[in-house]
Amino acid sequence: MKKKFLFMIPLCLFIIDYFLIKYQVIQSIDWFIYHLVQNLKCDFMTSFFKLCSTLGSTWFYVILVLTLVILKNKKDIWVGIHLLIIQGMNRIIKALVKRPRPPQIYHLVKETNYSFPSGHSMSAMIGYGLLVLEVQKSSLKYKKVIEIFLIGLSRIYLGVHYFSDVIGGFLLSLSYLLFIYYNTSLYT
């Protein structure tokens, strides 16, 4: 398969994830994983996952984008633009799908909008995913992949997303990431 079409694989998986949610096929898996992660709660883990969540937050990326604009590195500015595009896509999809978040009784952070797909997961995949593709040092690549995973996991731990929300966010952003990486002149 040509690399320029690789984006279709995670896109198709995202669509499948959406339909599994819509028709409540994945609901029991979502609740199983949700409660499994919820049972890990302790003060240290809560502090740790709040930090992880902050590294995937909109405010973190706003500050990052402004810093990149000030530094005027053209390639870095594009990372910021991609993050903004992903956040826009996320808001539109959430407004269309309107999946409620898990019950507020489990929330360790305040969230008011809809659940699917996870915006933190989408931003992490783009922001850190571009680094994974660009960086030559393999140890840094592994660290960034772990950060992406931890940001997604943090959203389940903090009680504001289901597993399928996080997976959906990862898949949609991975699709976008592969599309821009293999189909634009910025990265080829």
Q: What are these language model-derived features?
A:
Residues L13-Y18, I85-I92, I146-V160:
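Aromatic-anchored segments of alpha-helical transmembrane domains
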Residues H107-T188:
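Membrane-embedded catalytic cores of phosphoryl/pyrophosphoryl-handling enzymes
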Residues S47, I85-I92, I167, S173:
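Membrane helix-loop-helix hairpins that form the core translocation module of multi-pass transporters
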Residues N39-K50, L71, K75, V109, ...:
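Membrane-helix interfacial "entry" motifs
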Residues F5-I9, F49, K74-H82, L140-I146, ...:
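Alpha-helical transmembrane segments of integral membrane proteins
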Residues M1-F60, K94-L108:
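N-terminal transmembrane-helix/juxtamembrane module of multi-pass inner/ER membrane proteins
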Residues L64-L71, F149, F170-L171:
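Hydrophobic transmembrane alpha-helices of multi-pass, membrane-embedded glycosylation machinery
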